[in-house]
């Protein structure tokens, strides 16, 4: 992962001020903020931050680990539940805000930079796939095979919309893949081979991935095909695809931060401007996007935006040569017989 980035000086000062404020309490009575802070540090919890200096916590719960962003609803609920269980009192909002800010700063100052990823990660030559189930099970893949584990060295972060993948079958074959092909009405005979290549590319880490472009007439089932293909590697609970009336570079970057696989529905040739085309290529080739660092006015960080991408529409979408070179383009036909 390389040498961790140097923390902005103002964050270091903020940490000192926050710690001093929390510890400057009356000797005879602890504040609720200090009480909550002490409760947190009594738990089996590890703090760190990602390449954007966003703070994360890795919490040991029962026989597995869960990773929360400190600015997420999951960590909010974790702190409220912890305080309720230990004190049988309601956690005041001001106390939560104060302690959360302290912990976020603590994570960036005292924690280590971590490889925080969604769905797929790599560590020391081993690949890891987050199944996103309630047991927080992960598939560990090596050159010798694969196994299910709950103790991944990779910090897997989840969004609320990520759905679970099934437990892999050691005795499985390609029958399910062939069955998938039977639901997809693509024109070319080698379409399933190309889709298989795209699916395999979706599991790559720190590498370029092809963009899957699905084109066809209205009613051909482009949206359904996109959802089915995405569901093999990165199923969603509700947000199976993204449809925006106006696409911008910033909206693409935000989408990439929150999803491992991006499906853009009902694109038109006019949607893919030169700027958007360049950004799609940046995402497909795992290049970096520059953005302002948290809590600073001038510092910037480079965010890796390597993502798996599917776009669909009626028009010829990949007209610019750089986007065309990075795309698998498939034509889909309207189904001759509807499945009901």
Locate each region found by the language model.
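N-terminal nucleic-acid engagement/recognition segments and initiation subdomains in replication
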Residues: 1-171, 254-255
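P-loop NTPase catalytic core of nucleic-acid-dependent motor ATPases
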Residues: 61, 145-258
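Conserved catalytic network of the ASCE P-loop NTPase/AAA+ motor domain
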Residues: 204-206, 253-257, 272-274, 300-305, ...
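Conserved catalytic/switch belt of AAA+ P-loop NTPases
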Residues: 234, 277-300
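Loop/turn-to-beta-strand initiation segments
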Residues: 258-261, 288-290, 304-309
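Conserved AAA+/SF3 P-loop NTPase catalytic/coupling segment centered on the Walker-B
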Residues: 261-284, 314-325
């Amino acid at each position: 992962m390389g040498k961790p980035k140097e923390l902005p000086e103002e964050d270091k000062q903020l940490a000192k001020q926050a710690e001093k404020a929390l510890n400057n309490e009356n000797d005879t009575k602890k504040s609720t903020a200090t009480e909550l802070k002490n409760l947190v540090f009594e738990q089996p919890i590890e703090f760190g931050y990602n390449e954007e200096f966003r703070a994360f916590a890795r919490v040991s719960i029962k026989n597995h680990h869960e990773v929360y962003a400190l600015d997420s609803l999951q960590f909010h609920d974790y702190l409220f539940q912890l305080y309720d269980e230990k004190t049988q009192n309601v956690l005041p909002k001001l106390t939560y805000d104060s302690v959360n800010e302290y912990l976020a700063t603590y994570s960036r100052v005292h924690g280590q930079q971590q490889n925080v990823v969604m769905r797929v990660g790599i560590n020391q030559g081993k690949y890891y796939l987050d199944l996103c189930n309630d047991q927080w099970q992960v598939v560990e893949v090596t050159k010798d095979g694969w196994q299910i584990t709950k103790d991944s060295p990779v910090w897997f972060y989840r969004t609320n919309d990520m759905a679970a993948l099934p437990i892999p079958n050691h005795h499985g074959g390609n029958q399910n893949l062939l069955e998938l092909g039977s639901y997809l009405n693509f024109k070319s005979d080698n379409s399933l081979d190309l889709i298989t290549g795209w699916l395999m590319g979706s599991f790559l880490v720190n590498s370029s991935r092809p963009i899957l472009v699905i084109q066809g007439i209205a009613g051909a089932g482009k949206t359904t095909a996109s959802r089915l293909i995405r569901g093999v590697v990165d199923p969603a609970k509700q947000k199976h695809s993204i449809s925006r009336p106006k696409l911008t570079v910033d909206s693409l970057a935000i989408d990439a931060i929150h999803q491992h696989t991006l499906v853009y529905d009902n694109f038109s040739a006019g949607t893919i401007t030169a700027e958007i085309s360049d950004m799609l290529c940046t995402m497909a080739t795992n290049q970096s996007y520059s953005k302002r660092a948290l809590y600073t006015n001038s510092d910037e960080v480079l965010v890796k935006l390597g993502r798996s991408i599917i776009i669909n529409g009626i028009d010829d979408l990949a007209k610019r040569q750089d986007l065309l070179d990075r795309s698998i383009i498939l034509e889909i036909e309207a189904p001759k017989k509807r499945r009901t």
